[in-house]
Amino acid sequence: MIKFNEPSDGQIISFKDGVIQTPDKPIVPYIIGDGIGIDVTPVMKRVLNYAIGKAYGVSKEIKWMEIYAGQQAMDICGELLPQETLDAMKKYRVSIKGPLTTPIGKGFKSINVSIRQKLDLFACVRPIRYFPGTNSPMVESDLTDTVSYTHLTLPTNLSV
């Protein structure tokens, strides 16, 4: 059984009457991931910490809690996606993961697909908009403001 180090000064994100309640110090589980995840996940955490500090000063901060999936989980407990990881993702409601390797071979389901299915995550929502000062090959790129929705649980992904 895996035991994660829950930050003692963090709080759990909750819902009240269908509205998300984000505390000042939310606990956010993260999975480092495999391959490039080892390099990009720590940078992602630094960027988010900086952005929150810039927006809220010292009044708000993420309390990070490492959880395991992929090769790291295999090394620690002998399975690629431990139930404890899924339980933590459910309990804390918001989590972030780095890229996870999918071994090649028959009969193996992608860890990413397993996470989506077991947590009933059915949509990938991606806002797309222009940021002033960035270069773009599009004409009138400053008018770009849209959202892409991809359904993730159908046998074939459907994007709108």
Language-model segments: which ranges?
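Conserved small/polar residues in nucleotide/adenosyl-binding loops
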Residues: 150-156
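Metallocofactor- and cofactor-centric catalytic cores in central/energy metabolism, strongly enriched
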Residues: 1-143
